[in-house]
């Protein structure tokens, strides 16, 4: 679906559907008043009958409104006089998108500029959320359905903005389109079945991306190279599977050669049975989403490539399949990491930190400005923060603050958890330098503490997306595409875009 921005009068546009906001109590904004005047009071007459209360997201479709070039007018409730919050604004946009998808027209014009959104002064923030919501609503994953979804009639949406805000709105749509592309790619990878999406498949996806973009270099390290580098923890996770592990390195050079890169590290466990520490059978199908950290790094890179941001970015995808077998890692095994630290593996289901710790050590060679790892790491994060907010930890307050701010701006929020030294003691092992679990308490924090021991050479942050990477059960089940908006916003901010 194509999104464009124009600065024209709503009453003059020729379109299949014109969308106009109406407030509670039959209050008309400037656009609605102009449409009402052009239609000789048709809008007011409908509202007087009480057909639309004007609550946010309520809709009423009118056909053949006199005095207008639009075939239909869709009235949408915009609430009371005060500004809408992000959530209400997104719900309004999703409601409009839902109605438009059910209509026969190939285009629509949204005249929603009169609506104010709290904390979104100017046009950029408001139009960015609007565009992202509209584009996200167009996502369909039916690759394995014998009956595909009906082709959508709606091909183009025009967003109206006043002349003063036109440039900001256009920039917002440009950024939103890139983010939506990245989110769709992330969701596609996450939704693929694990018999298709394994480490070698992700490596092929990376190579395909490299062929499509000249400025992107791709290197794939196989299990032999992983072992040669001394990545004992990484190798241990995949040794029970017939699908060999892969470390995928993608290097984008959009900035000056002398500029230090940002590094994104993604956990890519393409299926997690728990290994010998086997998970319960109920809901295990959702462990195909354990690679959503890597998928979100892929998606963020897609957005960066589309926008051609003037930064240097290295993406490291730590991909393995965690399976039980005669050759699998056992609880009690001790491995030596690339850093030289030894790890006692008390629970083979705490495998994400094992592939990440060696990858974080590998990241040192790029002399990064900052390293951010993204992982569906702990069920404890879902207990602590639910499915609305990602967990965030780090060793640098400025970096953590930048990510928190990016999350707010992108409406893809994170919440900081502590990394106090007292938590480190829970990882003590009588037999190795460190244990891979820290007991039943503060599981998200102790996982972050584990990773912090391998990230002392640079500014580092860790995003635990166990609660936000996918939606469980119901008709909306599937990968969410998060935290692509947060990560892309962080990089947009660093690029000054």
Swiss-Prot record:
Protein name: Probable cytosol aminopeptidase
Main enzyme class: hydrolase
Protein purpose: Presumably involved in the processing and regular turnover of intracellular proteins. Catalyzes the removal of unsubstituted N-terminal amino acids from various peptides.
InterPro entries noted in UniProt: Leucine_aapep/pepB (IPR011356), Macro_dom-like (IPR043472), Peptidase_M17_C (IPR000819), Peptidase_M17_leu_NH2_pept (IPR023042), Peptidase_M17_N (IPR008283)
Cellular component per GO, a single term: cytoplasm
Gene designation: pepA
Active-site residues, as the UniProt record annotates them: 279, 353
Gene Ontology biological-process annotations: proteolysis
Main location: cytoplasm
Residues annotated as binding Mn(2+) 1: 272, 349, 351
Subcellular location: Cytoplasm
UniProt entry keywords in alphabetical sequence: Aminopeptidase, Cytoplasm, Hydrolase, Manganese, Metal-binding, Protease
Annotated cofactor note: Binds 2 manganese ions per subunit.
Xref: Pfam families: Peptidase_M17, Peptidase_M17_N
Binding residues for Mn(2+) 2: 267, 272, 290, 351
EC numbers on record: 3.4.11.1, 3.4.11.10
Matching SUPFAM superfamilies: Macro domain-like, Zn-dependent exopeptidases
Family label: Belongs to the peptidase M17 family.
Reactions that this protein is recorded to catalyse: Release of an N-terminal amino acid, Xaa-|-Yaa-, in which Xaa is preferably Leu, but may be other amino acids including Pro although not Arg or Lys, and Yaa may be Pro. Amino acid amides and methyl esters are also readily hydrolyzed, but rates on arylamides are exceedingly low; Release of an N-terminal amino acid, preferentially leucine, but not glutamic or aspartic acids
NCBIfam families, sorted: PRK00913.1-2, PRK00913.1-4, PRK00913.2-4
MF annotations from Gene Ontology: manganese ion binding; metalloaminopeptidase activity
